From Swiss-Prot:
Disulfide bonds: none annotated. It catalyses: a 5,6-dihydrouridine in tRNA + NAD(+) = a uridine in tRNA + NADH + H(+); a 5,6-dihydrouridine in tRNA + NADP(+) = a uridine in tRNA + NADPH + H(+). Pfam families: Dus. FMN binds at residues 16-18, 70, 139, 200-202, 224-225. Keywords: Flavoprotein, FMN, NADP, Oxidoreductase, RNA-binding, tRNA processing, tRNA-binding. Belongs to the Dus family. DusB subfamily. The gene is dusB. Its cofactor is FMN. One of its GO terms (molecular function) is tRNA binding. This is tRNA-dihydrouridine synthase B. The keyword Transferase does not apply. The active site is at residue 100.
Length: 321
């Protein structure tokens, strides 16, 4: 699949997730088979750009693959400025967030709240597309409520404004992450526009990936929550799409290697004083299958030292040897 001048190595994309898809996680997903990874959402509000969190999110160099940065906001001028600044910092694709259902984001008329205002959507899209010389993509939901699914209208508008690819999550804003994603709306959009369509929502295993591609006709898949603690899902899905066969479960030794590498990278990226806090949620996701009683996770979450975290993980996996 192509996005503008860029040829993706496959049709699997790691979704942008706030507080999760930082550079260490994106790098790991790429190494585990993702064809593209998208950064955490960056606010277009320049007042927050000086925070430590924003400064780290604006570091786009020294990572593999096509550097794709997602921006969020509701002011067309601010969004255009944010796009320009991120391109100057190394972004090769700009993705616009109109899919986030979080109240904190929607209260500022950003994310999926924008779907109620097609005229504002148009102004933002035109502003960003005209501001940069790299491809601009868009992520949306199917609408703002089940009775107000307007993704076909937004998709056609996006194509007219010069958007190079469109990701659709198969729920409305009102649905949050409740219930099941639906793919009829994504299929309808695919039949109405010619830009690449990326299907998103509840793609949790290779069989589901194949089924969603076949049903919607989508050009690619975006995977988010299913990759938390399981970044090798991209490799599993790609192997199944290529061969029709399932890979065997990842050996425990490989899980250990990936987890410990990920934790070290988090310590290095955020600094040991903060990295150990960020690592806690990732370790919890990795070990959901292996530590169902939560005892180790509770013990691990009480550790307040980076090196002690790594020692605890070594001891934990030794018990399985």
């Amino acid at each position: 699949m192509r996005i503008g001048q860029y040829q993706l190595r496959n049709r699997l994309i790691a979704a942008p997730m706030a507080g999760i898809t930082d550079r260490p996680f994106r790098t790991l997903c790429y190494e585990m088979g993702a064809g593209l990874t998208v950064s955490e959402m960056m606010s277009s509000n320049p007042q927050v750009w000086e925070s430590d969190k924003s400064r780290l999110r604006m570091v786009h160099v020294d990572e593999p693959g096509i550097r794709t940065v997602q921006i969020a906001g509701s002011d067309p001028v601010e969004m255009a400025d944010a796009a320009r600044i991120n391109v100057e910092s190394g972004a090769q694709i700009i993705d616009i967030n109109m899919g986030c259902p979080a109240k904190k984001v929607n209260r500022k008329l950003a994310g999926s709240a924008l779907l109620q205002y097609p005229d504002l959507v148009k102004s933002i899209l035109i502003g960003v597309v005209n501001a940069v010389d790299v491809p601009v993509t868009l992520k949306i939901r199917t609408g703002w409520a089940p009775e107000h699914r307007n993704c076909v209208e937004i998709a056609q508008l996006a194509e007219d404004c010069g958007i190079q690819a469109l990701t659709i999550h198969g729920r409305t804003r009102a649905c949050l992450f409740n219930g099941e994603a639906e793919y009829d709306s994504i299929r309808a959009v695919k039949q109405k526009v010619s830009i690449p369509i990326i299907a998103n929502g509840d793609i949790t295993n290779p069989h589901k990936a194949r089924a969603v591609l076949d049903y919607t006709g989508a050009d690619a898949l975006m995977i988010g929550r299913a990759a938390q603690g399981r970044p090798w899902i991209f490799r599993e899905i790609q192997h199944y799409l290529d061969t029709g066969e399932l890979l065997p479960p990842l050996p425990l030794a490989e899980v250990k290697r990936l987890l410990c590498t990920h934790v070290r990278e988090l310590h290095d990226f955020y600094g040991q004083a903060k990295g150990y806090r960020i690592a806690r949620k990732h370790v919890s996701w990795y070990l959901q299958e292996h530590a169902p009683d939560d005892q180790f996770r509770r013990t691990f979450n009480a550790i307040e030292d980076a090196s002690e975290q790594l020692e605890a993980l070594e001891a934990y996996f030794e018990n399985f040897a």
